[in-house]
Each structure stands twice: as C-alpha cells, then as structure tokens.
Amino acid sequence: MQDLSLETRLAELESRLAFQEITIEELNVTVTAHEMEMAKLRDHLRLLTEKLKASQPSNIASQAEETPPPHY
C-alpha cells in the first residue's frame, strides 16, 4: 500500500514538473516576443520624436538672436 502511494505521488510530481516546464517555455516565448515588440516601439517613438522636433521651430531664440539685457 505504501509503495503504491509513493508511486502515485511520484507520478503526480513528474506530471506537475512536465506541466511547469511547458508553462515556463511558453512564458519565455511570450516574454521574448514582448521584448522584441518593445524594442520596435522604442525605435518608432524615437523616430517620431525626432520628426516632431524637426518639424516644430523652437520657441526659444538662440543666444545670437536674443537682445542683450539692460545694464544697470
């Protein structure tokens, strides 16, 4: 009776381990895909930011364009 219980418990543990290994592999694939997508989105955001900066003139005048401050 004791041997059957040990065999049953061992089979259950092996089954759980196999399920966990499959789950870990699936999660690894998902995380890798998300990392790749985030890298693409970061690149896209950087390009859009550069385009936006290039298309909008700055409201701050350069130092050469500024009028000199009054002297006291």
From Swiss-Prot:
Pfam families: SlyX (PF04102). Signal peptide: none annotated. Residues 52-72 are annotated as: Disordered. It comes from the Bacteria. Transmembrane segments: none annotated. Residues 55-65 have a biased composition (Polar residues). NCBIfam families: PRK02793.1 (NF002750). PANTHER family: PROTEIN SLYX. Belongs to the SlyX family. This is Protein SlyX. It comes from Escherichia coli O139:H28 (strain E24377A / ETEC). The gene is slyX.
